[in-house]
């Protein structure tokens, strides 16, 4: 009843405290007597009464700003004038500084500049990655002094007459050719003055039946094909250089003969290259 009186505002002084008994299933042992009194309940007048008028006086009187979005619930906040709105003009391009001007007119130029920067960055990153990978791969390979000292032993009995066998030596293809009697006579009869890189067949071999060459074309470094070409020796498919059975250039753009490495015969059936 006191709470009702507190919420009654100006009618609180005329209200009095009352008690009402409700009959129950059990009879009470002692009948409670409530003496009647005409005194008004004592209220704390210093305490503010929570009513509509008092709460309205405490509420802010400034206008509200409501925000609504599809991804977040609606919210209401007070409008603050002391907040500094961030300015992103320093990060914008001159073409889009004016907010009232359409950016579609300068979109092509801006896209072109972005594509140019992206392409330049991609090329730079690819070049740097290529150098890093090349350095990493070269660090795992043998050093130059080890490669210079490396040698390879070749068993000549494994190469039949008229055939050419390829080996890997110091990272390059090595050709070992077992020439027939016909090939030996044919290459020995070639006129040296007709050759682009003049060199006699006997200057390129230690034993006439064995020709040992580095299988790298002297034009642009391609690997020639054995037993091919117009002269029955080697043919480079990259740019059409023709070599004879002695490895001498006879036709095509290659300027020099195939290189002859250093080698020695340790026996009739064994040769060491390097």
Swiss-Prot record:
Record note on modification: Proteolytic processing is necessary for the correct insertion of UQCRFS1 in the complex III dimer. Several fragments are generated during UQCRFS1 insertion, most probably due to the endogenous matrix-processing peptidase (MPP) activity of the 2 core protein subunits UQCRC1/QCR1 and UQCRC2/QCR2, which are homologous to the 2 mitochondrial-processing peptidase (MPP) subunits beta-MPP and alpha-MPP respectively. The action of the protease is also necessary for the clearance of the UQCRFS1 fragments.
Cofactor note: Binds 1 [2Fe-2S] cluster per subunit. Fe-S cluster delivery to the Rieske protein is mediated by components of the iron sulfur (Fe-S) cluster assembly machinery that reside in the mitochondrial matrix (including HSC20 and LYRM7).
GO biological process, one term: mitochondrial electron transport, ubiquinol to cytochrome c
Organism the protein comes from: Bos taurus (Bovine)
GO molecular function terms attached to this record: 2 iron, 2 sulfur cluster binding; metal ion binding; oxidoreductase activity; ubiquinol-cytochrome-c reductase activity
One protein family per Pfam: Rieske
Residue span(s) of domain Rieske: 187-272
Enzymatic class: translocase
Cellular component GO terms, alphabetical: mitochondrial inner membrane; mitochondrion; respiratory chain complex III
Family per similarity comment: Belongs to the Rieske iron-sulfur protein family.
EC number from the UniProt entry: 7.1.1.8
Name of this chain's protein: Cytochrome b-c1 complex subunit Rieske, mitochondrial
Chain ranges on the Mitochondrial intermembrane side, renumbered to this chain: 141-274
Disulfide-bonded cysteines: 222-238
Coiled coil stretches, renumbered: none
Note: The Rieske protein is a high potential 2Fe-2S protein.
Catalytic reaction annotation: a quinol + 2 Fe(III)-[cytochrome c](out) = a quinone + 2 Fe(II)-[cytochrome c](out) + 2 H(+)(out)
Membrane topology qualifier: Single-pass membrane protein
Cofactor(s) listed: [2Fe-2S] cluster
This protein's UniProt keywords: 2Fe-2S, Disulfide bond, Electron transport, Iron, Iron-sulfur, Membrane, Metal-binding, Mitochondrion, Mitochondrion inner membrane, Respiratory chain, Transit peptide, Translocase, Transmembrane, Transmembrane helix, Transport
